[in-house]
């Protein structure tokens, strides 16, 4: 049975039931040696390696995740000044009245992004940006890092 084998090397687990490795939204069975090898790899590389042997758990989810990761990098916004990629930071609320003495004071949510090359800082409307599934993935990835 496929669940009794390491997804990455195809070997049967040892005496200690070994472990699982997170590949996208799925947990894949792995032996201790493969887990050590996969520790430094990116999510994309782990997903690709899980599909090689053809015994991965939920391979369709892995393929969807690979497509999401590769397409999202193509959708990453570029800096208007130098053309480098922008990196998102956590969503923030800008407040017109810092003392908040009135419940009617103006405030709005923004999604900041910055350029690591030239330092330019841009603000995006989070409601609009999060509608694009590729950008939503990038936001989650950047803000968790």
Can you say where each PLM-predicted feature lies in the sequence?
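Residues immediately within or flanking Cys/His clusters that coordinate Zn2+
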Residues: 3-6, 28, 73-76, 112
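Short cysteine-rich clusters marking metal-coordination/redox-active sites
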Residues: 6-9, 31-34, 79-82, 115
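Short Cys/His-rich Zn2+-coordinating modules
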Residues: 11-19, 54-69, 95-102
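Short, non-ligating residues that shape and space the ligands of small metal-coordination modules
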Residues: 15-16, 40-41, 85-89, 124-127
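Short linker/helix segments within small regulatory modules
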Residues: 18-28, 95-112
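Short metal-binding segments enriched for Cys and/or His
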Residues: 32-53, 106-131
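Compact soluble domain cores
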Residues: 68-94
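A short, surface-exposed interaction/processing loop segment used at functional sites
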Residues: 126-145
């Amino acid at each position: 049975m496929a669940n009794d084998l390491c997804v990455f090397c195809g070997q049967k687990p040892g005496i200690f039931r070994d472990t699982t490795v997170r590949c996208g939204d799925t947990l894949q069975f792995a032996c201790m040696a493969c887990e050590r090898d996969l520790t430094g790899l990116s999510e994309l590389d782990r997903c690709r390696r899980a599909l090689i042997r053809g015994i991965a758990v939920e391979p369709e989810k892995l393929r969807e995740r690979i497509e999401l990761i590769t397409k999202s990098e193509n959708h990453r916004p570029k800096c208007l000044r130098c053309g480098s990629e922008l990196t998102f930071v956590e969503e923030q609320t800008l407040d017109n009245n810092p003392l908040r003495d009135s419940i009617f004071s103006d405030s709005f949510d923004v999604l900041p992004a910055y350029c690591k090359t030239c330092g330019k800082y841009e603000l995006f409307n989070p409601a609009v940006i999060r509608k694009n599934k590729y950008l939503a993935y990038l936001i989650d990835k950047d803000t968790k890092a």
